[in-house]
Regions:
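Feature 926 captures the class I aminoacyl-tRNA synthetase adenylation module centered on the KMSKS loop
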Residues: 1-32, 38-40, 97-136, 160-532
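Aromatic-residue-lined binding/catalytic grooves and analogous aromatic/hydrophobic interfacial grooves
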Residues: 43, 59
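A short glycine/serine-rich beta->alpha loop
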Residues: 65-82
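Conserved, well-structured core segments
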Residues: 85-89, 239
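Short, solvent-exposed helix-loop connector elements
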Residues: 153-161
Length: 532
């Protein structure tokens, strides 16, 4: 308002901006026209008002052709309050001037509060200056907090949520580090063309094909989320993808990396590099750093920056395979739940597990056996989850009336047939999930059963002497590998292992040596390792 200009029409000096405006945001509604050169015949360098503001601002006043290029805006965003202020004033002025909206899409969002839901005030001591946040949590973590927030809810901003985000990002960091570490050992150097084509020239296992499909799925989900301008959906899709990649693919493929399985290297590299491209709009600095380690410094002809690589190509994922592994993972989760309920460690082998209600997992029995550390996996056999069922009289009474006592008696006798999704068939009637009340579980001796309404997983928890011995071997292997890590040994270093009175453990000598990279096993006074 302190800037004075000369009127180009009459030559009057000292012309000032009109001070009486209703609201700065209402006044700002003219921005799509005033800053883009609407109806301006020529481009004016150095300022607005036919050059009258020259040397007061470095901005140019574009010409009308420039306005036509950029009008209407693809996207504008501000707080919800701008619906009645800036968004409205832009729309009103634009319709009056050119009979057209000045934007193609609008995103409004709610307030930012502290992590406890209170407004931020300097006098309250809960205000976080931007410079402090940049220093303590980093720009990418700040961006993640903003983008992870559904726009119709208040953002609770603070160092607590930032710490949780860093914990999640550590999984991604460790996954990239895992591949880079083994790639450096084995000299793995893919070509940049492999990123567009996917893992080619190798025979992919079903697990590899699943990760390719999972990668294609996260690209599709992220693309849809960005097109809908809902970045919290992108982050949810990416977090689920990283969990699957780390806690399923890498964990189930570790030995393949020890043995330099080219298909595993190519598949994981493709998935990680593609995933970084997906998340780069949210966390540009970390994504670019990891890209350089994973791609730019490793692939001839690769763009130096992830932002020169473009968006991943959209492909149709194998939905059937994705559904199969999703069900397998759910079975494994239920099996681990049953182990936890029974108080049996995962390193303790068990004899068998029986699964009921599975539609897609029958071809993945070996994976289930390995994940749950059992010798046998059976489907649609074994004990059934015995859960006491009662009729929901409030819902069932009006529908079946006099037949309710018969249904109640049949439920008490355990004659209900599970139909999935909480539905049951009993006494000739099919009951919906809300027509049945599920009571306490009835225990079965020697078995622990976990049930989620569709799938039932029954775990045989009896441990004989053979299972107990194998459990001790697993515990020993875990302890020795922890000792290797604590001693700072490299992944490829060989050791000499000393066992105190090896006894029956030596019957599994070859297994122990293979899992601990031991060249030989000696018997001594205490458990010890030394570099071979």
């Amino acid at each position: 308002d302190a800037v004075e200009i000369r009127c180009p029409a009459c030559g009057t000096e000292g012309v000032q901006r009109i001070a009486e405006i209703g609201d700065v945001w209402l006044d700002a509604g003219i921005v799509p026209f005033s800053t883009l050169g609407w109806q301006n015949p020529t481009w004016i360098e150095g300022g607005y008002g036919n050059g009258a503001a020259k040397e007061l601002t470095g901005a140019d006043l574009p010409d009308h052709d420039y306005w036509q290029t950029w009008f209407p805006a693809h996207w504008v965003s501000e707080m919800r309050e701008q619906i009645r202020l800036w968004f409205y004033s832009q729309l009103f002025m634009s319709v009056c001037l050119v009979d057209k909206a000045p934007f193609r899409s609008v995103l409004g969002y709610e307030k930012m509060l502290d992590e406890h839901g209170r407004p931020m005030h300097g006098s309250w001591g809960n205000l976080i200056p931007a410079e402090e946040a940049f220093s303590r949590m980093g720009a990418d973590v700040m961006r993640w907090q903003y983008c992870d927030q559904p726009p119709d809810r208040d953002l609770l901003f603070g160092y607590g949520p930032a710490h949780e985000i860093k914990r999640k990002l550590l999984t991604l960091w460790n996954s990239v580090g895992f591949l880079v570490r083994y790639a450096n050992i084995e000299g793995f150097r893919p070509t940049f063309d492999d990123l567009a084509a996917g893992p080619t020239g190798v025979e992919l296992r079903p697990l590899d094909r699943w990760l390719v499909a999972r990668t294609e799925k996260v690209v599709a989900d992220a693309t849809a989320a960005l097109e809908d301008q809902l970045t919290h959906r992108l982050i949810a899709a990416f977090e689920s993808f990283v969990d699957d990649l780390s806690n399923w693919y890498i964990r189930r493929s570790r030995r393949r990396f020890y043995d330099y399985d080219d298909a595993a290297f190519r598949t994981l590299w493709f998935a990680l590099a593609t995933g970084l491209r997906v998340i780069s709009p949210v966390m540009p600095f970390l994504a670019d750093h990891l890209w350089r380690n994973l791609v730019a410094d490793r692939c001839e002809g690769a763009p130096e920056s992830i932002f020169l690589a473009g968006w991943p190509e959209l492909r149709r994922p194998d939905e059937r395979l994705l559904a199969e592994i999703a069900e397998v993972r759910r079975i494994v989760e239920l099996g681990r739940e049953a182990r936890s309920t029974a108080g049996v460690k995962l390193r303790q082998p068990l004899r068998r597990v029986y699964v009921r209600g599975s539609r897609l997992a029958h071809h993945h029995a070996q994976e289930i056996a390995e994940e749950l550390r059992v010798d046998e996996v059976g489907f649609d056999q074994g004990p059934v989850a015995q859960i006491r069922l009662l009729p929901n009289l409030r819902v069932l009474g009006p529908r079946l009336g006099r037949k309710v006592p018969e249904i109640k008696a049949a439920l008490e006798r355990g004659e209900a047939e599970e139909l999935g999704e909480g539905r049951v068939r009993v006494a000739g009637e099919e009951l919906a999930a809300d027509e049945v009340i599920r009571g306490e579980r009835v225990e079965i001796a020697g078995w622990t059963i976990a049930y989620d309404g569709t799938l039932s997983v029954a775990l045989d928890t009896e441990i004989d002497s053979d299972l107990a011995l194998r459990g001790r071997v697993y515990e020993l292997i875990h302890t020795v590998n922890t000792m290797r890590k604590d001693a700072g040994l490299e992944l490829t270093d060989r050791i000499v292992l000393t066992l105190p009175d090896g006894g029956d453990l030596l019957g599994h000598r070859d297994w122990i040596k293979a899992e601990t990279l031991a060249t030989r096993i000696e018997v001594g006074d205490a458990l010890a390792i030394s570099k071979a």
